[in-house]
């Protein structure tokens, strides 16, 4: 099943873990997924504290995004007010939200539900993503690409069905697959 892997700063992860933040703000939304879908949470290392309840540099859990709220920011920086009550659950101050999304632009509020947190946070390399041939090595140079030439012709294929390990966290979010090991590693919050 296709999912998202989302990078979230440690201070926001802490609020999510405490149940205080139930909306995550983003400038974009996945076009290939419809709600509900699973979002894995990667706690970023930037400005992180080691003594936090949210372990930096790890996949700390996941949530189900059961609704995406469009956030329209007008040219003057005002946010369309009909959805502000929901957006307050993001814990992002009004002016910061407008600045982040950009004047005259549309952003998105991902509603967080069914939060599950790992007892032992996972390394990013335990995540999987799709290889679309846009990587630096291209398919012909990829370590997962198999090519064989014979008198009857040549044969080539991707040995991993275009699903590869994630090697670095996403800037914001990326598509991933529900292949992260979960054996007794989750608790329900």
Model-derived features: positions:
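Structured alpha/beta reader/binder surfaces that contact nucleic acids or chromatin modification marks
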Residues: 1-189
